[in-house]
Amino acid sequence: MSRDLTAVQAKAATLVEALPWLATFHGRTVVIKYGGHAMIDPGLAASFAADVVFLRYAGLRPVVVHGGGPQIDAMLRRLGIEPVFAAGLRVTTPETMDVVRMVLVGQVQREVVGLLNAHGPFAVGVSGEDGRLFTAVRRSAVVDGHDVDLGLVGEITEVNPTVIQSLLDDGHVPVVSSIAGGVDSDGRRCVYNVNADTAAAALAVALGAEKLVVLTDVEGLFADWPNTDEVISRLTADELEKLLPGLAAGMIPKMEACLRAVRGGVAAAHVLDGRVPHAILLEIFTDEGVGTMVVP
C-alpha cells in the first residue's frame, strides 16, 4: 500500500533548513525575556517551555528572564492594594516590593521552572539577588516636567554572571527573576524592582550572549505606527535609535533593551510575538524568521 509522504517530507525539509542555524548557534548563549500573553495562556506557556528545552537539546545555552506584571497586580488587589504606575513603571512602596518579591520568586519563577522541568531536570530558579547577580540603584522618573518618586524601582548598574555561567556550564537552564539587590538613600541594603526587559538585556551583555529574544504581545516593530500593516523584519541599532521617540509606550522599554544589548556586544536582538506558538524556534531556525531583528 502506497503512503502519502508529503507531510513527512515537509518535516524533513524543515529539519534540513534548520541545519546551518544549528551549526552556527551550537554552544552559544541565548537570553530570552519571557512575559506577556505567552505567560498566562496555558497552551502558549507549554509551547514556550518546549522551545526552550529544544534549544537546550540542540546544543544552545538558553537563559530565561521573566517578569510577572499581571500576577503582581492580581496579588496586590487580593491584598487590598491598588497598583499604581508612573511613567510606565510600577510605583513600588516597601509593601508593594514585598509582594513583587513574593510573586516573582515564589510563584512565577516556580511555575516557569516546573514547565521546563516537565521535559527533564534542566531548569534552576535564580533571583537577581542570588550571588549578587544584579546590583541596582534607585531610579527616578520625570512626568510632565516634574520628578516622580517611584519608590523601590531600580536601574541595574552591575551584573555578576558567575552563578549563571556555572549553571550553564553544568547543563542547566537558569530561570531568573527580575529583582536586584542594592542600598537605599540611607546606605541600608534593600531590594529593588527592576524592569525585566532591561534585566534581560544587561544579562545578555554580561554573558556575551549571541542573542537576546524578547517575547511581546505584538507581531514585532511596526514600520509606520499606529498603522499595523507592515512589520520591520530587520534594522540596525542606528535606525532603531531614530525610531524610538515615536514608538508606542509599551514598546519603548523592549526596543531600548534591544538597543542596549546590540550596542553592548550581543550579535542580534529579536522582538517576537509570543502569541505565536513556537515563535522562538521559527525565528532562530528558519530562513524567514518572524518578528523584528535588531543588529549592530
UniProtKB/Swiss-Prot annotation:
GO cellular component, one term: cytoplasm
GO terms under biological process: arginine biosynthetic process via ornithine; L-arginine biosynthetic process
Family: Belongs to the acetylglutamate kinase family. ArgB subfamily.
Pathways involved: Amino-acid biosynthesis; L-arginine biosynthesis; N(2)-acetyl-L-ornithine from L-glutamate: step 2/4
Keyword Chaperone: no
Primary gene name: argB
Residues binding substrate: 68-69, 90, 193
Localization per Swiss-Prot or TrEMBL: Cytoplasm
Function: Catalyzes the ATP-dependent phosphorylation of N-acetyl-L-glutamate.
Signal peptide: none
Protein name: Acetylglutamate kinase
Molecular function, one GO term: acetylglutamate kinase activity
Organism superkingdom: Bacteria
Organism: Acidothermus cellulolyticus (strain ATCC 43068 / DSM 8971 / 11B)
Coiled-coil annotated residue ranges, if any: none
Lineage summary: Bacteria, Bacillati, Actinomycetota, Actinomycetes, Acidothermales
A Pfam short name: AA_kinase
Catalytic activity, as annotated: N-acetyl-L-glutamate + ATP = N-acetyl-L-glutamyl 5-phosphate + ADP
